[in-house]
């Protein structure tokens, strides 16, 4: 029988087209049945037509259909891929940033950590739990892959509510290592053995070795990273180029320097001034930039590249939304590799998945979802234990109670636990104003937060 794959949120052209292209190029998934699902029938119909036209043009034997009925879509599913957002993403994100700011709370980014990350979680996790409830009822053995953020809070809450489900979080930040390290170390990516780990958007490179010699490569990373990243262009440079030339910069599969014709950044350590502090003081290289890593650290506001973060937000909101995605027969995300690994019992090592901590990071409890490498075979996704240095472990440990209280607040629908989740978060520097802040957020985001009592 053909493998059945369900895409939840397929009305999003960026998610739908990109994932379809990944699937269509796969030999192991050749001839699969793909069910597109979205609550927006107009957007869903566009994705369906585009997919069918592409299959006809390329003469590929995949079966594609679409439905707005989720339970119908899930019947017989072996794999379910989720990428959803609720409401007007940017309007709600602005509230997540601006309202806490009115109460004296400064945030680096406000999407996945801090107060913004909490309210984002409170909105998006309930509908994901609804999806998971249907999976548990209709296709409980299916593997579920999630691309939605805030990743670690979503995965933690889902596994608390549905511990029996095969739910895996996927993020592409790990791909930064493939973009930068070969150029930095003057070797091919295939010659590097790498391990990274932590929490989603809060992970660091832990080990690096040259395969041909077996020698430690991390010493070279620490020695060469300062000069390399100090001159690497960032989003301020990309935004300026886009405004000047009226076209987007394509950094997929290459560095920003190559995309901008070999130019250096207009200022040092673009997007990475917090990154620089972590590298210098903790001797570990983050696998992401300040906008993500800084969301979880109370002192990040002092040292983050705010110019780069604001320019990234502007670029993301004003330019990326206008890009017309297309279906291409090339692998862009790693979820297809995992599905292939399960179907073929390959036993390959996947660089990063978000799964419950089953002793993979000793400084963290079992309930929290961690980002670690994993072995993929016919039995599924098996995390690999990693050694986290004490200092990084301390930063990660600050998230334990936040994730615990976020999950409990959502499952119980508890306003009091939301207040507590804010009060244990070191990004928050307020106390008496927090109950009022929570009430204002519930009022302003009533369609999504009215379950909190």
Swiss-Prot record:
Gene for this chain: palH
Chain residues that bind Mn(2+): 171, 201
InterPro entries the record matches: GH4_Enzyme_sf, Glyco_hydro_4, Glyco_hydro_4_C, Lactate_DH/Glyco_Ohase_4_C, NAD(P)-bd_dom_sf
Reaction equation(s) it catalyzes: Hydrolysis of terminal, non-reducing (1->4)-linked alpha-D-glucose residues with release of alpha-D-glucose
Assembly: Homotetramer.
Entry EC number(s): 3.2.1.20
A Pfam entry, by short name: Glyco_hydro_4
A GO biological process held by the record: carbohydrate metabolic process
Residues annotated for substrate binding in this entry: 149
One GO MF term attached to the UniProt entry: metal ion binding
UniProt cofactor(s): Mn(2+); Co(2+); Ca(2+); Fe(2+)
Result after altering residue 173 to S: Loss of catalytic activity
Keywords: Calcium, Carbohydrate metabolism, Cobalt, Glycosidase, Hydrolase, Iron, Magnesium, Manganese, Metal-binding, NAD, Nickel
Regulation: Is inhibited by EDTA in vitro.
Induction details: Down-regulated by sucrose and up-regulated by palatinose.
Signal peptide boundaries: none
Entry binding sites for NAD(+): 3-69
Function: Alpha-glucosidase with broad specificity. Hydrolyzes maltose, palatinose, maltulose, trehalose, trehalulose, turanose, leucrose, sucrose and maltitol. Is not active against alpha-galactosides, e.g. melibiose, and alpha-mannosides. Shows an obligate requirement for an O-alpha-glycosidic linkage, since it is not able to cleave beta-glycosidic bonds (cellobiose, gentiobiose, lactose, sophorose or laminaribiose). Cannot hydrolyze phosphorylated alpha-glucosides derivatives.
Cofactor note: Binds 1 divalent metal ion per subunit. Mn(2+) is the most efficient metal, but to a lesser extent, can also use Co(2+), Ca(2+), Fe(2+), Mg(2+), Sr(2+), and Ni(2+). Cannot use Zn(2+), Cu(2+) or Cr(2+). Binds 1 NAD(+) per subunit.
Name of the protein in its database record: Alpha-glucosidase
Catalytic-site annotation from UniProt: 172 (proton donor)
């Amino acid at each position: 029988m053909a493998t059945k794959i369900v895409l939840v949120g397929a009305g999003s052209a960026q998610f739908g087209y990109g994932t379809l292209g990944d699937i269509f190029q796969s030999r192991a998934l050749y001839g699969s049945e793909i069910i597109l699902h979205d609550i927006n029938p107009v957007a869903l119909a566009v994705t369906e037509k585009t997919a069918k036209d592409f299959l006809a043009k390329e003469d590929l034997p995949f079966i594609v259909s679409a439905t707005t009925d989720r339970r119908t879509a899930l019947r017989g599913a072996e794999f379910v891929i989720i990428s959803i957002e609720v409401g007007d993403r940017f309007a709600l994100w602005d509230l997540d940033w601006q309202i806490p700011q009115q109460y004296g709370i400064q945030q680096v980014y406000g999407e996945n950590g801090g107060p913004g990350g909490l309210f984002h979680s409170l909105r998006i996790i309930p509908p994901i739990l609804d999806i998971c409830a249907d999976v548990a009822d209709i296709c409980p053995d299916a593997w579920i892959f999630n691309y939605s953020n805030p990743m670690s809070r979503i995965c933690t809450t889902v596994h608390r509510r549905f511990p029996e489900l095969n739910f895996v979080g996927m993020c592409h930040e790990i791909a930064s290592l493939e973009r930068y390290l070969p150029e930095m170390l003057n070797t091919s990516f295939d010659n590097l053995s790498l391990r990274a780990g932590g929490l989603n958007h809060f992970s660091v490179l832990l080990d690096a070795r040259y395969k041909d010699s077996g020698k430690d490569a991390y010493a070279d990373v620490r020695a060469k990273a300062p000069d390399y990243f100090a001159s690497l262009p960032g989003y301020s440079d990309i935004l300026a180029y886009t405004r000047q030339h009226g076209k987007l910069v394509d950094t997929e599969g290459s560095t920003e320097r190559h995309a901008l014709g070999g130019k250096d950044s207009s200022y040092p350590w673009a997007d990475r001034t917090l990154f620089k502090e972590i590298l210098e003081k903790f001797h570990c290289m983050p696998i992401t930039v300040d906008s993500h890593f800084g969301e979880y650290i109370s002192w990040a506001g002092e040292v983050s590249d705010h110019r780069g973060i604001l320019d990234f937000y502007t670029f993301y909101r004003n330019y990326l939304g206008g890009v017309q995605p297309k279906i291409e027969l090339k692998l862009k995300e790693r979820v297809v590799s995992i599905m292939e690994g399960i179907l073929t019992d390959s036993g390959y090592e996947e660089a990063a998945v978000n799964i419950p901590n089953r002793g993979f990071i000793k400084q963290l409890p079992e309930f929290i979802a961690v980002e670690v490498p994993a072995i993929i075979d016919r039995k599924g996704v098996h995390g690999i234990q990693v050694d986290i240095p004490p200092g990084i472990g301390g930063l990660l440990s600050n998230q334990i109670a936040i994730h615990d209280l976020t999950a409990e607040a959502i499952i119980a629908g508890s306003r009091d636990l939301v207040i507590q989740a804010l009060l244990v978060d070191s990004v928050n520097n307020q106390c008496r104003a927090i109950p009022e802040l929570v009430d204002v957020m519930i009022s302003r985001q009533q369609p999504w937060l009215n379950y909190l009592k």
